Amino acid sequence: MIDDITAQLRAGRQVLEALERELAGRIASFAELLADSLAGGRKLLVMGNGGSAADAQHFAAEIVGRFKLERRGLPAVALTTDTSILTAIGNDYGFDAIFRRQVEALADEGDVVVGISTSGNSRNVQEALLLARERGCRTIGLLGRDGGSIRDIVDLDLTVPSADTPRIQEGHITIIHIVCDLVEKRLFP
């Protein structure tokens, strides 16, 4: 059991080291893009399925509430939280439309729309990101594995270099925390 724990912790460290080596510049670009958008009166929309839905909610909570600094709330919406909206859209239009329909209703030009997908192939996330781009939003993918089909349709992809879902999710939440920290420091010096 201890060997398994040690192996998992080692694998987690390797992913974090890869983020530093391979994605630091992209993380900085993501933070700058989001800070500029929020400073300009725009909002963050974020989505994902399963564990990525939880990460979307976590991200929105840090932006609306606070991360580390006492500050005013900033506009962010997790498109994963309203069961009535999700089930109505899913029932009437299908599961692939649950995020796209919300982007249609809520996204404005200049907003930042983030799709989180460990595979990079979540169809409902992909469809929403495509519509967001059509509407003039900036699109970001927090992805895993090889980035999947989403990698090619977003303005900026942050693909965690791992094929192991738990390690990808750990990479995503680390990126989210770093971005929240950088956004707060930039907007509330």
Swiss-Prot record:
Which Gene3D superfamilies has this protein been placed in? Answer: Glucose-6-phosphate isomerase like protein, domain 1 (3.40.50.10490)
Instruction: Quote the InterPro entries the UniProt record gives.
Output: GmhA/DiaA (IPR035461), Phosphoheptose_Isoase (IPR004515), SIS_dom (IPR001347), SIS_dom_sf (IPR046348), SIS_GmhA/DiaA_subfam (IPR050099)
Q: Per its UniProt entry, what is the enzyme's top EC class, as one word?
A: isomerase
Localization, per the record, is:
Cytoplasm
Q: List the disulfide bonds.
A: none
Note one Pfam family from the annotation.
Answer: SIS_2
Required co-factor? Zn(2+)
Any single Gene Ontology cellular-component annotation: cytoplasm
Q: Which reaction does it catalyse?
A: 2 D-sedoheptulose 7-phosphate = D-glycero-alpha-D-manno-heptose 7-phosphate + D-glycero-beta-D-manno-heptose 7-phosphate
Q: What more is known?
A: The reaction produces a racemic mixture of D-glycero-alpha-D-manno-heptose 7-phosphate and D-glycero-beta-D-manno-heptose 7-phosphate.
Entry protein name: Phosphoheptose isomerase
Q: Which species is this UniProt entry from?
A: Geobacter sulfurreducens (strain ATCC 51573 / DSM 12127 / PCA)
